[in-house]
């Protein structure tokens, strides 16, 4: 129970950090936590006319099994094909409901939080459906 609460807290913090990270990279945040019964999209953003549906995967550095190998750890690899399919389905519905004809894509942001120093390391992987993770 405590671990689940900790995981949710890290996820919530990670999503906020990812949104700020994307804004600094020139993205406009359109929505956050878009939910449907079969899935949720953490961040919906736009950049250069393309709608971006962003899945955020965040972990706390303190929870890593081997902190010395932090640079090798990739939280974005936790996004599997099943999750990508759910994201694609939810994204398509969002575009249909909003009658949005623009191009869209699925992106992933991996976040490693260093809670002791209140810092984070973020990585953006664009076009995740193309196997860019």
Residue ranges of model-derived segments:
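Conserved catalytic cores of phosphodiester-cleaving nucleases, focusing on short active-site segments
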Residues: 22, 43-68, 87
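Solvent-exposed beta-strand sheet faces enriched in polar/charged residues
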Residues: 33, 57, 107-109
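Residues at secondary-structure transition points
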Residues: 5, 9, 13, 38, ...
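Active-site metal-binding core of divalent-cation-utilizing nuclease and nuclease-like domains
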Residues: 24-53, 132
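Acidic-basic catalytic patches of nuclease active cores, encompassing PD-(D/E)XK
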Residues: 1-32
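Mg2+/Mn2+-dependent nuclease catalytic core
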Residues: 60-93
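Domain-level recognition of nuclease-like catalytic cores that cleave nucleotide substrates
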Residues: 96-133
């Amino acid at each position: 129970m405590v671990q689940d609460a900790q995981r949710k807290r890290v996820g919530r913090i990670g999503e906020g950090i990812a949104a700020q990270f994307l804004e600094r990279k020139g993205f406009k945040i359109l929505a956050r936590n878009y939910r449907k019964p079969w899935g949720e999209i953490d961040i919906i953003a736009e950049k250069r006319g393309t709608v971006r549906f962003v899945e955020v995967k965040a972990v706390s550095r303190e929870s890593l099994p081997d902190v010395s190998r932090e640079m090798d750890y990739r939280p974005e690899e936790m996004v599997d094909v099943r999750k990508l399919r759910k994201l694609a389905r939810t994204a398509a519905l969002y575009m249909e409901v909003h009658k949005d004809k623009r191009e869209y894509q699925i992106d992933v942001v991996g976040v490693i939080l260093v809670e002791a120093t209140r810092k984070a390391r973020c990585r953006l992987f664009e076009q995740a459906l193309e196997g860019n993770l």
